């Protein structure tokens, strides 16, 4: 069930689902596995927000166990394609493709809440069928592994061989460790205090 928010104005009351209300504030929430449905929604929201105001930042909050590499790369490419900077924030878990998208935010604008967990690993896949079909699938997984590792290396500043070693198995990090690794830029422990005027 999606929560509904009621807003009152001089013209009466309006009801919004919580995600639509957040979108008005330029906040997108990835709170599930990366699938074609979730990726299409996120890409559409990013394109909409860019059309609304190409100069204003977008905020992508991530609580995701990961998911489809192809669909995640669609989100990644959109993040790089649009004009607004994309702040990424881990809330809970950013694992696998979730961690990749967390790292894909604009440099200097990638963060995590203090008790979140971040995990990187190599792409997973399976194949069945004739030997030639299995080889095609294995080659594709190896290609994706190389592509993702190179992007992580470019974005974290870690040498490619370190990324290859660390993604060979599940590699969990605290937010502080993710900052040291270069996956994110800061840990959020509390909201900044607003000046009173």
Swiss-Prot record:
Biological process GO terms, please? protein quality control for misfolded or incompletely synthesized proteins
Q: Where in the cell is it found?
A: Cytoplasm
Q: What is its main location?
A: cytoplasm
InterPro entries found in the cross-reference section: ClpP, ClpP/crotonase-like_dom_sf, ClpP/TepA, ClpP_Ser_AS
Q: What is its EC number?
A: 3.4.21.92
- MF terms in GO: ATP-dependent peptidase activity; ATPase binding; serine-type endopeptidase activity
Would I find Cytoplasm among this entry's keywords?
Answer: yes
Gene Ontology, cellular component aspect: cytoplasm; endopeptidase Clp complex
> Which PANTHER family does the entry mention?
ATP-DEPENDENT CLP PROTEASE PROTEOLYTIC SUBUNIT
Q: Which family does it belong to?
A: Belongs to the peptidase S14 family.
Q: What is this protein called?
A: ATP-dependent Clp protease proteolytic subunit 2
What organism is recorded for this protein? Parasynechococcus marenigrum (strain WH8102)
């Amino acid at each position: 069930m999606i929560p509904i928010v009621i807003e009152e104005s001089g013209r009466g009351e309006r009801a919004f689902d919580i995600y639509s209300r957040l979108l008005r504030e330029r906040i997108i929430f990835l709170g599930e596995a990366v699938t074609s449905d979730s990726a299409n929604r996120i890409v559409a929201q990013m394109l909409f927000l860019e059309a609304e105001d190409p100069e204003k930042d977008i905020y992508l909050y991530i609580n995701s166990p990961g998911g489809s590499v192809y669909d995640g790369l669609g989100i990644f490419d959109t993040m790089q394609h649009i004009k607004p900077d994309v702040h990424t924030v881990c809330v809970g878990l950013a694992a696998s493709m979730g961690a990749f998208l967390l790292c894909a935010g604009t440099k200097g604008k990638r963060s995590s809440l203090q008790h979140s967990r971040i995990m990187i690993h190599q792409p997973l896949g399976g194949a069945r069928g004739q030997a030639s079909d299995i080889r095609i699938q294995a080659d594709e997984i190896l290609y994706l592994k190389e592509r993702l590792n190179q992007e992580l290396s470019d974005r974290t500043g870690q040498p490619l061989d370190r990324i290859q070693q660390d993604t060979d198995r599940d590699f969990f990090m605290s937010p502080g460790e993710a900052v040291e690794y270069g996956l994110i830029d800061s840990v959020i422990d509390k909201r900044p205090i607003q000046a009173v005027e």
